[in-house]
Structure formats: C-alpha cells, structure tokens
Amino acid sequence: MFQNSMKQRMTWEEFHGPNLGYVLELYDQYVKDPESLDADLKEMFDELGAPPGDIRAASQKNEEADFTAGSIQKIASAVKLAEDIRTYGHLNASVNPLRKTQEKQELFPLAEYGLTEQDVKKIPASVICKDAPKEVTNGLEAIQYLRNTYKKSISFEFDHVHIFEERNWLMKKIESGELFTPKSKEKLVEVLRRLTEVESLEQFLHKTFVGQKRFSIEGLDALVPMLDDIIAKSVSAGTTNVNIGMAHRGRLNVLAHVLGKPYEIIFSEFQHAPNKDLVPSEGSTGINYGWTGDVKYHLGANRQIQDEHTKTARIALANNPSHLEFIDPIVEGSTRAAQETRTESGYPVQDVKKSMAILIHGDAAFPGEGIVAETLNLSQLKGYQVGGAIHIIANNMIGFTTESNESRSTKYASDLAKGFEIPIVHVNADDPEACLSAVQLAVEYRMTFNKDFLIDLIGYRRFGHNEMDEPSATQPMLYDAVRKHPTVKNIFAEKLIHKGIVDKETVGKIKDAVQKRLEEAYRKVPAKKEDMTHEIVLPEPVSNGFPDVDTSVDFETLRKINQELVSWPENFNVFDKLKRILERRAKAFEDDRKVDWSLAEAMAFASILKDGTPLRLTGQDSERGTFAHRNLVLHDSKTGDEFIALHHLADTKASFAVHNSPLSEGSVLGFEYGYNVSSPETMVIWEAQFGDFANAAQVYFDQFISAGRAKWGQKSGLVVLLPHGYEGQGPEHSSGRTERFLQLAAENNWTVANLTSAAQYFHILRRQAKMLLREEIRPLIIMTPKSLLRNPNTVSEVQELSNSSFKPVYEMSGLSHQYDKVTRLVLSSGKVSIDISDHFNKMEGEKDWLHIARVEELYPFPAKHIKAIFSKLPNLEEIVWVQEEPQNMGAWNYIEPYLREVAPKDVKVRYIGRRRRSSPAEGDPTVHKKEQERIVSDSLTRKN
C-alpha cells in the first residue's frame, strides 16, 4: 500500500524547505547504503528516484535543516495514512440510509500510524493532499479534510484503477472540492419538485390500484433526478442519443418522468382499459406495443427532448423482459449503432459523443448474473466499445427475500466492476445532492476517458418485491426500520426548509400541483375494459410472408466483384497456402465457372455492399472463419499488416465491419441484436463458433429475437449462422439445436434454413438484405455447413448466382422423370441430404421408385412447394423424413404435422433417423459412422 502511495502520489516537488534538505541527506545515505535506512524510507526512495538538479540546488538555501530520521518516518507514515483514507475511507462512509452514523467505528486514528497531532501539523498540507483548498494549511488539517471528504454520504473506490492519469484525475476532482460545490436554490427546488412527482405517482398508484404489481421505486427515488442530470449534462455536451436499460424496479416512474409517458396511459394499463385515444400515434413519446403485447413494467418508450440551448436528443428506454441484466449488451449494441456512420466503404466511422448508454442494475443481479461480466468485458474491445457506459446499481440491499449476505460473496454489490478497472462511487439515496455529485463525476469521467463508470445508489425497498408481497414475514427487523424511516422527499424538504430555501407552504403547493395533475389524468381513463373476444390478427404483410424479390446478380458484375475480392496491394505478402486458395478463386470465372461456399458468401457480401447496404459480421474467429474458409481479413506474413478486400470495392457507399468476438455467446449476440434493432438498414450477422454453443445465449433467442416483435412491435433482421452437421465430432460439435428454433417458430417470427449449396446461401443472404427495411422483415437463422464447405456437391455454377433465386425446396438433379413410377418421396434437410445424394448416385439397379428433395427453408413451412412435388407423383405411397439428429431433436417433431396435413390421402408419413436420445450425438466416431450409414441406407432401401 505504501509503495502504491509513493508511486502514485509523491514527487520531489512536494518536499519544501527544511523537509527537502533533510530528505536529500537521507537520499544520499540511501545511494551509499540502501539497507541502512528504514524499510519504508528505502521503499519511498525506490519510487522517487534521483532528485532533479534544480531541486538539489534549491536545497542549498536550507542547510539549517536539523530534522531527524524519525521526522522523515513521520512524513512517510502521514502519507500512508492519507493513502489509506483514500483507499478505505468508503468503509467509514454514511452511505446506508437505514444505518445510523454513530454505529460505525472510527477508522484511521493517528496513533495507529505512530503519529500525534503535533507530528502531522509540522508537515505541509501539500505533502498530504496537494489538491486541498487553500484554507487547509497544514498536514493535520489535510488529514481531517481527507477524512471528511471520503466518509460523507458519498464515498469512492478507485484504487483498482491502474492508469495514473485516471487515478490522478479522480483524486483531483474529489479532493479539490469541485464535486461538492453547493447547488443553486433553483436547482434544489427543481430536485424537490422532481422527488415530489416521483413519490406522489407511487403513492397514487398504491392507493388507486390496490394490490397491483408496479415494482415501486420508493427508497431509491433519487434515481429519477440522477437520470435527469445525466441526460441534461450529456445532451449539453453534444450527445444526441441516450439509451437506457433497466429492469422492472422503478420502471414505471422512469417511463413517466424521464421518458414522458403520460400518466393517463400508465393508469389505463392498470385499469386494464386501454384507450386508443390516449396513445399518441405521433409526437414526442412513442409507446411500443406488439401483437400479444407485454406487461406494463416491461414496455419501453422513446422521446425527443430539447434543452434550454435548443439542442435536441432522442431518449430511449429499451423494452425488457424479466430476465434481469440481459438487456445490458442490447443497450450497448444500440448505442454503438447510433455512434457509427455507415455511408462509406471501410469500417464505420464512430463518434462516441453522439450516443451514450445508461445501464441500471439490481444489487442482487449485478454480481449474480454472468451476463453482467460478459457485458463489462466488451467495454474496451474494438468491435464493441461505446466510449463508456454509465452504470447505476439501484441498490435496495435485498433481492426479493434474499439478503446480500446470501446473494453475493463480496462486500459491495459493485465489486465485480473492480476487475474491469471501473471507478465506483457509493452514494446514499437519501442525499439527493450527493447523488447529483456522483452523477457529475460519472459524466465528466466518461467524457474525459471514454470509459465505464459505476454509481452504487444505496437505498432501500419500501414495500415487498412487488406490492402483493409482505416483506415483514422474512425481514421483520429490516421492515420495522423501513416503516419508521421518512421518505427522501420529506427528508429533503425538511433540509431545504431548515436552510431557508423553501417554506412549508411552498412544499405543500408543489405537492398539491402534482396531485392535481395525477387526478386529472386519472379522470381521462375509461372505467372498465371492453370485452375483447377477437383473436389477435397479424399485420397483413407479416402473415403473407416474403414477397418475391430478385436476388440475382449479372455475370459481368460478379466477375468484377471476384477480381476485387482476390486482389491485394503489390507489396502485401499473403500467406503462401492462403495465396494458392485465393488464386484458385480468381479462376472461378475463367475455367469451370464453379463457386464454392466461401466465395459465394464473399460475393454476396460484396454485392450487398455495392447495393448500398452496410454489413456487420461478428463472432468467435469470424474474420478467418472457424473452419479456415472465410479469410476476409488478410495478414501480411512479414509485417502483420491487415488488408480487407471488402473495404476496397469500387463505387461502394456502405461500410463493412468484421470483428472477432470475445469468447462469449450471450453478450455478443445481445449486442448484435441491439445494433440491428437500432440500425435496421444494416445487415447484422452473428456467427457461432459451432452451432452447439448458441444455447449459451438462449435467453436472447427465447425472449428477444423470436418474440420481440410480438411483445413490443420490435422488428429485427438479424442473421444468425450456426455451423451444424453430424460428422463424428461428438455431442458438443454436431448440433445447432434446430429443434429449439423450430419449436419457437410461429407468426412468421423468423426464418429457419438448413442449406446445401453455395447458390442457396448467396440468394438467401441477398434476399435478407433486400427485406431489411420492409414490414415483412424477420430474423434469419441458418444452419451452416462444416465439412460441406469443401464438399464438391455444395459447389454451384456461376449461372445459379446470376440467373436464379432462392429455392425453399430443392429437388435433387439427375433423377428419372418417370414420375408415375415413384412410390417413395425422400425429404431431408442439410448435410444428410448430401449423404443421401452421394449414396443414391453410387446405387446400382432400378431407382425410379425414388424421388428426393431437400427442404432448405424449414420455417416458414414451404407447403406450396412440397404440394407441387406431390402433384407430379400420382402413385406416391409414402413420404419419409430423414434426419441425422435423434427423433426428439432436429426437424421431425416440427415438420411431421405439417407433412401429414399436406400429404395426399392414404400416403404414409414415416421417420428415418436416430432413435430418441438425451444426447445429440455419439462420442465414438466409429459408432457415428455406422449409424450414419444405416440412416442413409434405410432412406434409399425399398421395404419388403
């Protein structure tokens, strides 16, 4: 600790007069024999180093110094004391509104450091606290000043911040007194008015809608004026977009007072009497409703604001399910999207001042949910940083009925942030002025260093987890204290009355005015809900599905694109093996005119960019590709320089971003979803390293990507690539869990595809890009190949890219056209289709009884295309569905009822594949091979 204090705090310039002379004498002794000095002195000189020449010259005037070695020991001890106050002062701070100050044991007594008041008085104040106000004249006063500064109703933790510039900046802001400049009378009255609004709304809801859940903010009321200040300061500094993420605690109050959601709309939701006249179709506030909708404390909103300097900004509160903290990376992705300009080739141009993220966490969820650590890890990464997010832990010191000693292994709810070197402020929610000081520090730190900052807002929860819950059953002592504790509005009003800033009459008038507004709003709400017996109807464009769009690209354009994709600067040294691969690609339009999977993808990306659509691709190892197939980023084998051909396409007015992601599925997928929602014109692609690992992000598929539009009217065109296929690599490298996506498929909520050709992949990507800004847009989930990436049977003719389109069902080529002889239709999807094709081509004897087709688009179910095949097969007897996955996985449970519904009368529908299993695949490659051979053989063998 002493070493840190010297390294971070002391320089030779801080010694003056006799002190300096004596320190120089000791330094000379240190140079001759370091071991002759006390250990603390030796450590101090280790850190100080040699004195500058001008310092030694100045000391010549102070030869009368008669200090002893003991005196310099006192200086070192005093400096250590000061550093300990900075580091541990928070332990003695008054940040808990329910704990009396006198209950705390006083820390840092002088005697523990071998000091007396007289000892410390002799030391210059600047040695102890160089930024102290001028009225602090000696070391004793400096120590007392530090004690008072670091043990207020606001306390600080930044010893874990290792960058000197940041630590020094924080120390100066705190110790100079700048943070604690008294607020103006107007500001204090404004805060009182805001606290009155916050409290009055909660009390009105409590009395009017008895027993209904609202997840009250009471006990953390100061959160609203804090958000006001963060937004005001940021907008004044040039921010034009503020994204807020929070859970349900206090959400209704934030919606009403920060987002401007009218009281009458909130009341109508409690009354279960939605009145369309109350919902603005246009205006400053947009409320999001989907088809099935969501509960009132999950809904988001957005609002345009204008400050007194006529600067405008958009404030958005993200829609949020009850899955705590999972909104965090979504908000950061939305923020990154708003910061970037994507209208030129190359990487997008980011301006972190344009947009900011505010994340409001729970004290139990912040240390408890792993997605928080995943999100914090994004904060300094090139592909994901947002110039710093401001985090606020809405800390009511309890999680439902679980107290903090049962829910975390750390002292503070905020301790996780220390691992990411995020400065932390703890502040008492009953002291609004201290709360605003915390906000000031947070906003200025973010603006200065473009890094995250965390405020631990410590309050309490006035009622139970929800208003139907009785907390005294599990926390009787705590809630006895809460019931006796005055509200922050009353505490603050009394403080202002005592200071003569307002009188009781003014306080009463403020409350009466707020109450009048609440009552007027309530009178606008219908008395009861109208009967709703009709079924929810999807918007027509959604129910009709995708229209036909032209996704072809003419041959000459493709040829030019390919030339650009396989070109690099003259002096750029491409890795030899990769160079040969690129040279083969260069000949794709000269020799056999065949395009493999990776080239089809690159040409799809290039053509999408040339059409003016920005593109963002991320995932683990996505620059190269898990299977070394993509190689969009070339690395000079001698210099390490990078070259991205997609950044150098001619006549392109759209950006291309590609980033290797951290080893996280949840935070990265959430980030990309947020980016896509806020940048709907951008084609955003997330790729799993293997599809098996996507379930680490299952919450995002379940709560957001599949259902966001139904719940909140939130459209998304996100593309998800999941490498999938059974190749003997065991249960963790075989399955993207197609069944889970198909189980969630309804209301045309997404497209699920399992593709088998380069051309199909090319066209489905281009179709998605063309649909991005249309009402019909939906996410696209693709089970992508692994070994098939280099399988000649997935290669496509160039003309399939220039003269064709995506086919939801793909009939195998080379089959007999004697349709009247066909008695079995073999349907499959994905890699097993290629296995079937290979086996069929090697079969000898009569094969006309078979017809084979691949279902490339599983959802929406391609009924029309499959019926068209049936119509050609008059003597069809059976339809077999063949899959690699076990019977309880894959597409079978989803597709069976569809097939039975569309199958001709008396035609059987049968399953061929692995039996029902708990694990997706065999661990033994030999067993896998035998099972795979059986499945393929059975599908092509006539039953006796």
UniProtKB/Swiss-Prot annotation:
EC number(s) stated in the UniProt entry for this protein: 1.2.4.2
Molecular function GO terms recorded: oxoglutarate dehydrogenase (succinyl-transferring) activity; thiamine pyrophosphate binding
Residue ranges, annotated region (Disordered): 914-944
GO biological processes: glycolytic process; tricarboxylic acid cycle
GO cellular component: cytosol; oxoglutarate dehydrogenase complex
Comp. bias regions, Basic and acidic residues: 925-936
Keywords noted in UniProt: Glycolysis, Oxidoreductase, Thiamine pyrophosphate
SUPFAM superfamilies, per database record: Thiamin diphosphate-binding fold (THDP-binding) (SSF52518)
Cofactor field: thiamine diphosphate
InterPro entries: 2oxoglutarate_DH_E1, 2oxoglutarate_DH_E1_bac, DH_E1, KGD_C_sf, ODO-1/KGD_C, THDP-binding, Transketolase-like_Pyr-bd
Parts of the chain that traverse the membrane: none
Catalysed reactions listed for this entry: N(6)-[(R)-lipoyl]-L-lysyl-[protein] + 2-oxoglutarate + H(+) = N(6)-[(R)-S(8)-succinyldihydrolipoyl]-L-lysyl-[protein] + CO2
Physiological role: E1 component of the 2-oxoglutarate dehydrogenase (OGDH) complex which catalyzes the decarboxylation of 2-oxoglutarate, the first step in the conversion of 2-oxoglutarate to succinyl-CoA and CO(2).
Subunit structure: Homodimer. Part of the 2-oxoglutarate dehydrogenase (OGDH) complex composed of E1 (2-oxoglutarate dehydrogenase), E2 (dihydrolipoamide succinyltransferase) and E3 (dihydrolipoamide dehydrogenase); the complex contains multiple copies of the three enzymatic components (E1, E2 and E3).
Family according to the record: Belongs to the alpha-ketoglutarate dehydrogenase family.
HAMAP family given in the database record: SucA_OdhA
Protein name: 2-oxoglutarate dehydrogenase E1 component
Gene: odhA
